[in-house]
Amino acid sequence: MPSPDSMTFEDIIVDFTQEEWALLDTSQRKLFQDVMLENISHLVSIGKQLCKSVVLSQLEQVEKLSTQRISLLQGREVGIKHQEIPFIQHIYQKGTSTISTMRSHTQEDPFLCNDLGEDFTQHIALTQNVITYMRTKHFVSKKFGKIFSDWLSFNQHKEIHTKCKSYGSHLFDYAFIQNSALRPHSVTHTREITLECRVCGKTFSKNSNLRRHEMIHTGEKPHGCHLCGKAFTHCSDLRKHERTHTGEKPYGCHLCGKAFSKSSNLRRHEMIHTREKAQICHLCGKAFTHCSDLRKHERTHLGDKPYGCLLCGKAFSKCSYLRQHERTHNGEKPYECHLCGKAFSHCSHLRQHERSHNGEKPHGCHLCGKAFTESSVLKRHERIHTGEKPYECHVCGKAFTESSDLRRHERTHTGEKPYECHLCGKAFNHSSVLRRHERTHTGEKPYECNICGKAFNRSYNFRLHRRVHTGEKPYVCPLCGKAFSKFFNLRQHERTHTKKAMNM
């Protein structure tokens, strides 16, 4: 290996064939360019005399091999001209002499790089200044507001747009900028591409973001579900919706394996494992993992119902409740069972129905082991063990385990019966009672036993019937331990103990 004193530029240069160059990725080509410039800079700094033709050939190699074949150093007009780049023009107008001719110049007649405004007495210094200039300049496409740190990246950007025939060379009105001027100049470009909404004045940096925002004003929903026809503003919302049809749950908990259709639901679920329940209700002390859940819960205490129906005026504490209610007006049932074709107005009702086909009961009580098809039913059941009744009537003080029971009870005070049968006009205080009544007109019996085929118009009667097959007797007498399949039968039995006690 040559010593540093005897080392020449020819000793350290690397030549690539076109085939070898094609095997390099963008980062490797950039690394080669940087190392090559470092080598030139180092040899110049230790006073080495460099041959102009070798240095310029090496500087040109990256461009030759990049398929654009733009020679900035020999003056060929392939894609771009020297006069378009002022500092290159000045350097090569002044630097065409041979090295021997350069040495014949006196101190009073140096080479002058007009663009840089500095005098050089040696071609080596001029070459070093070219390298420094290339390093401290940025290449800018004024049309697109893009800034590039090297000439190769700028040319790659230019090539992308020149492939499109609708763009002319006027798009590449570029300039060189000093590092010190980069920040204010880039701000100028940012201002040029600021996009403003004509309706509300909100500004955006990308045209795609502006178009998406404008759909809020226009109500445009270009992304439609091919299964139920429901439309959405954003394609991401459509993808989430499609999972309600397919049942896809791509977000799985790495601790328990439970899967979710939304990443936000997974994050909320993960808090159950970490027991992060920092959101505490100051009225009842109940804790929540998410502040939005706390706000929803607080509305049960305050009676706050900010979401009102435009058709009937009925108000709800949650936006999802309002959307579900609106379907009672328009009859929309977007969620269809792929096994029997039955349609539902809410996805939770569909999931609950599907479990009637497969018998799945994923939600188990940790106290008694009883399992349920819905988590809400499990929570309702757990209150039997705890005795919790969080929903209290502000008129009479009676408390209930469920908010729906409280609402139904409040109608006994107000006399409100908002659910009316469109066939006979009879009104009811609860939607479930209306649905049960409508079956007397239609003869519908949606609850069918999968063992004997008997059908029922009420879920309660269906549950009682199943106990005939299963032998289940959930109602146990605390005095003698005798069990019954119906609560009514337990009450009758308990009276026998009362009579015995009275006769003694």
Curated annotation (Swiss-Prot):
GO molecular function, one term: DNA-binding transcription factor activity, RNA polymerase II-specific
Stretches annotated zinc finger (C2H2-type): 195-217, 223-245, 251-273, 279-301, 307-329, 335-357, 363-385, 391-413, 419-441, 447-469, 475-497
Listed Gene3D superfamilies: 6.10.140.140, Classic Zinc Finger
GO BP term, example: regulation of transcription by RNA polymerase II
CDD domains noted in UniProt: KRAB_A-box (cd07765)
Keyword list, A-Z: DNA-binding, Metal-binding, Nucleus, Repeat, Transcription, Transcription regulation, Zinc, Zinc-finger
Function: May be involved in transcriptional regulation.
Name assigned to this protein: Zinc finger protein 596
